[in-house]
Amino acid sequence: MIYNGKKINFIDPAITNSLNPHKNSKGFCNAICPDQVCGTITKKNSKNISTNLNNRKNNPQNYDFDYDNIPEDNYIVFILESPHIEEFDTKNQIPIGPAQGNTGNNINIFLRDVIDGSPMFLTSLQMNFTYSLVLINAVQYQASQGTKPLDRKLTDENWINFWNENFKSDLIKRIKEIIKKSKDCKIINLCTFGHSGLHYFVNAELRVNGLSFYEGYHPSRNWAIPQRRKIW
């Protein structure tokens, strides 16, 4: 599917989101939320990590990830669940990008702490390498239907339906395209667990496709808890 002149996934454009606003929707949008480059992470030595994160609120389309034109680079890929209210300009019915709101704030605040608190992951990073940080949603549609407070049961049901229809295979295609063009690539599953174990859906699909990956807690609330700032 093409958006803003960029290939944002491998889904047939004929496959559309048929969801409508829910009675408790406070910010519904049925558009695709493209994956984006969030910034860079550099390992200068065994104990020195630097991060440089983008302000994606301004001209967010500039950061959309184009799967037709992937630079040869080093990548760290965060797999999230699905976009919610903050990820869209619902007034104009257009996407902003993944991990806005509390999720994005916690990535900005705690990213270095998370990496520093994950010895196995930190050791795996190449010395003096700069990695582009890519944020991708396993399901790029708003599974929550913009409900506020979040309707977890509804979100899980919609997410699983989207996952089984097309996003399961599409996620793997997206990740494989990034790996194909990367010098070094780290995949990290940060998808929420939800009430239905969504995190494990992603784990299983990565494993069955022979992809190496790390795991962690979703940043939205978990990274505010020191014990959950880790990748394993």
Question: How does the language model describe each region?
Answer:
Residues 85-88, 142-145, 197-201, 221-226:
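Short catalytic/ligand-binding loop motif for oxyanion handling, primarily in non-cytosolic enzymes
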Residues 1-7:
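Intrinsically disordered, low-structural-confidence terminal and linker regions
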Residues 8-188:
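A polyanion-binding, active-site-adjacent surface
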